[in-house]
């Protein structure tokens, strides 16, 4: 099986959004503010993204903001969970963010979700629950 991780480009946005809509948890509702139009600034101005392709089809993606160190997205299509793709697509994003000079990166995710276990297993440290009830995590630049 051919698996490739590469930097995301604008032409990937429709496929990335399809992945975002095909997750088991942290699903977008019909009134969500996250639409295809939400992605370009994160890919071009305030961050960078990566996609993971299996046999040429995007099945996972990750996006991080280089100014704030916020992780905007790490998602894997529900049909491709358990293959290590989340870790694979997250790694270049984490490396890139630290290469931008950040000492700390952070994210939030739904409390009580499987994502918490994923983040803890991939080196993130739980920092608490935010005012919205989401679990917060951070990673510090490796010494």
Residue ranges and their predicted role:
Residues 1-11, 143:
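Conserved N-terminal entry element of GNAT/NAT acetyltransferase domains
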Residues 7-73, 77-79, 90-92, 96, ...:
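Acetyl-CoA-dependent GNAT
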Residues 53-55, 139-142:
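Active-site beta-strand termini and strand-to-loop segments that position acidic
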Residues 77-91, 98-100, 111-117, 121:
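Conserved glycine-rich acetyl-CoA-binding loop
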Residues 106-116, 131-134:
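Conserved beta-strand-loop-alpha-helix junction that forms the acyl-donor binding cleft
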Residues 120-129:
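Conserved acetyl-CoA-binding loop of GNAT-fold acetyltransferases
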């Amino acid at each position: 099986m051919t698996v490739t991780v590469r930097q995301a480009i604008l032409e990937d946005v429709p496929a990335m959004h399809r992945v975002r809509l095909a997750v088991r948890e942290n699903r977008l509702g019909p009134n969500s503010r996250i639409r295809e139009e939400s992605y370009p600034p994160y890919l071009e101005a305030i961050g960078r993204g990566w996609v993971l392709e299996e046999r040429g089809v995007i099945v996972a993606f990750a996006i991080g903001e280089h100014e704030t160190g916020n992780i905007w997205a790490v998602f894997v299509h529900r049909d491709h969970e358990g293959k290590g793709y989340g870790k694979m697509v997250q790694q270049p994003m984490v490396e890139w963010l630290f290469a931008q000079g950040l000492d700390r990166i952070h994210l939030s995710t739904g409390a009580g979700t499987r994502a918490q276990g994923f983040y803890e297993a991939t080196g993130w440290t739980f920092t608490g629950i935010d005012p919205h009830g989401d679990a917060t995590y951070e990673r510090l630049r490796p010494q």
